[in-house]
Amino acid sequence: MSSVSTSGSGAPKSSFSFGRIWDQYGMLVVFAVLFIACAIFVPNFATFINMKGLGLAISMSGMVACGMLFCLASGDFDLSVASVIACAGVTTAVVINLTESLWIGVAAGLLLGVLCGLVNGFVIAKLKINALITTLATMQIVRGLAYIISDGKAVGIEDESFFALGYANWFGLPAPIWLTVACLIIFGLLLNKTTFGRNTLAIGGNEEAARLAGVPVVRTKIIIFVLSGLVSAIAGIILASRMTSGQPMTSIGYELIVISACVLGGVSLKGGIGKISYVVAGILILGTVENAMNLLNISPFAQYVVRGLILLAAVIFDRYKQKAKRTV
């Protein structure tokens, strides 16, 4: 009897070990292979200028994906992030022009993101309304506010010091890249090293069990959506700085790109599973694919098809992983 249990426990251990290694680093390996292939076959891909451009291109999605990671890990998602990006940029531009104060404008943009996240979190956690319906509604509301505040037009920013947020270079790299790295580190530590992060994963794994175990589910969910709104607002402010204006029509459909990156990297749509390395892998893969398509002059319409296929593949892959875990 004991020999059976010993041999039975030995076999799964090695397979689990391999599965754990693949789960941790598999998509990073996929990115490495993709990167090498692009460096070989795509003209001008491996140049320093293009690498800086790639870093800038994924910086915004990297920031927003940090907040989306927590939403997905808790079993929810946030469809309002793209609208918050646009509205935060517009709000910042309008307030800077009205007050002639850079910091008041930035604070107003950040406050808008926090308030949007607070509304999402309260309605979802306290009123127990489905996250899809709630964030779909706030997506429309916030986008509408962006058009109302800007009168449907791009709002130019008169204070040129604001542009330094998007165009500053620190140690040879653009500031948005460093800010994205900082976001990834902070949110990674928050998820893996704090009680808040463990509570987030517990809620996503089994919300009722987490509640019975004493996890403050409502408070945790509200904080999660506030964080998502905050990082989306930061991304929107930096985007406005780089575009030298707040534009209400920007980042339409961006929420799907961010969700695709998270799920492609390995974050589960059902909740309870998520690591910052998954987000890094997902945004790097998506960013590399998009960069390669641009260098190859692939039609923008065809790029929509490719993005859709990647999203579909990510969802199918997530479904397969969940099914495989249940059968083990």
From Swiss-Prot:
GO terms for molecular function: L-arabinose transmembrane transporter activity. Part of the binding-protein-dependent transport system for L-arabinose. Probably responsible for the translocation of the substrate across the membrane. Disulfide bonds: none annotated. The chain crosses the membrane at residues 29-49, 53-73, 79-99, 104-124, 129-149, 171-191, 220-240, 249-269, 276-296, 297-317. This is L-arabinose transport system permease protein AraH. It comes from Escherichia coli (strain K12). It is a multi-pass membrane protein. Belongs to the binding-protein-dependent transport system permease family. AraH/RbsC subfamily. Its main location: membrane. The gene is araH. Pfam families: BPD_transp_2. GO terms for cellular component: ATP-binding cassette (ABC) transporter complex, substrate-binding subunit-containing; membrane; plasma membrane. Induction: Induced by arabinose. Transcription is dependent on the transcription factor AraC, the cAMP receptor protein (CRP) and cAMP. The keyword Transmembrane applies.
